[in-house]
């Protein structure tokens, strides 16, 4: 699971680290260096994320992996494939750098045969990811890259769905309170939790009679 900044901010800012880790089955939260930088830098301009930065500093080390964005042959190749520019030029475009490096690292690992899930809320980032999923499958069909590798994506609502399924929220009221806090942070989530389908059964268990 490789994360963009937005979804991570929502869980950090609302003290939902246990729910985040439960949602991904105890896997490691992987972030590119550019995302780690954004977690530390964005709160300087957007104070609603200051608490997220503090929580990230205390994030359990065994569940966190900040991966270097230093140039590699595969990252360079992926950058040229996805964006049509060299890596050094991409580095100079600070806007969306975290999101872009998330995609490049994910694609690089998928080419190496790993099963990768990218966590992103930005619609532009999702569109780019969908396009690269199609390209990867086409290359696998042609036999030009390992067939065992895969690339997929999930959004904050997907993570919340998974967290509900594994019983990570104490109650539906607890979930709704946290959701409303997340929705106030930015524009990525619907303001009304009812619009997400996340208060239905499933993902909540059936009512006992």
Model-based region annotation:
Residues 1-116, 123-209:
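Active-site-proximal, substrate-binding regions of enzyme catalytic domains
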């Amino acid at each position: 699971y490789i994360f963009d900044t937005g979804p991570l901010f929502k869980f950090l800012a609302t003290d939902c680290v246990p729910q985040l880790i439960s949602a991904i089955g105890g896997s490691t939260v992987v972030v590119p260096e550019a995302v780690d930088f954004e977690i530390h830098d964005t709160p300087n301009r957007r104070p609603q994320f200051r608490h997220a930065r503090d929580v990230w500093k205390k994030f359990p080390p065994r569940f966190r992996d900040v991966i270097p964005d230093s140039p590699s042959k595969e990252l360079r190749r992926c950058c040229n494939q996805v964006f049509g520019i060299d890596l050094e030029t991409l580095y100079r475009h600070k806007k969306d750098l975290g999101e872009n490096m998330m995609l490049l690292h994910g694609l690089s690992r998928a080419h190496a045969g790993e099963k990768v899930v990218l966590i992103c809320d930005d619609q532009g980032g999702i569109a780019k990811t969908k396009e690269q999923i199609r390209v990867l499958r086409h290359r696998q069909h042609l036999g030009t890259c390992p067939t065992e590798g895969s690339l997929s994506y999930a959004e904050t609502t997907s993570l919340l769905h998974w967290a509900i399924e594994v019983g990570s929220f104490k109650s539906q009221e607890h979930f709704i309170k946290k959701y409303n806090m997340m929705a106030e942070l930015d524009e990525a989530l619907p303001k009304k939790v009812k619009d997400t389908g996340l208060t239905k059964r499933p993902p909540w268990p059936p009512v006992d009679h």
